[in-house]
């Protein structure tokens, strides 16, 4: 689920591709 650009659980940054949830 973790993208190469986005962290596993982005808390400070909004979910770009809905990775946060």
Swiss-Prot record:
A type II topoisomerase that negatively supercoils closed circular double-stranded (ds) DNA in an ATP-dependent manner to modulate DNA topology and maintain chromosomes in an underwound state. Negative supercoiling favors strand separation, and DNA replication, transcription, recombination and repair, all of which involve strand separation. Also able to catalyze the interconversion of other topological isomers of dsDNA rings, including catenanes and knotted rings. Type II topoisomerases break and join 2 DNA strands simultaneously in an ATP-dependent manner. The gene is gyrA. Keywords: ATP-binding, Cytoplasm, DNA-binding, Isomerase, Nucleotide-binding, Topoisomerase. Few gyrases are as efficient as E.coli at forming negative supercoils. Not all organisms have 2 type II topoisomerases; in organisms with a single type II topoisomerase this enzyme also has to decatenate newly replicated chromosomes. Its main location: cytoplasm. GO terms for cellular component: cytoplasm. Heterotetramer, composed of two GyrA and two GyrB chains. In the heterotetramer, GyrA contains the active site tyrosine that forms a transient covalent intermediate with DNA, while GyrB binds cofactors and catalyzes ATP hydrolysis. This is DNA gyrase subunit A. Residues 1-21 are annotated as: Disordered. It comes from Streptomyces niveus. Its EC number is 5.6.2.2. GO terms for molecular function: ATP binding; DNA binding; DNA topoisomerase type II (double strand cut, ATP-hydrolyzing) activity. It comes from the Bacteria.
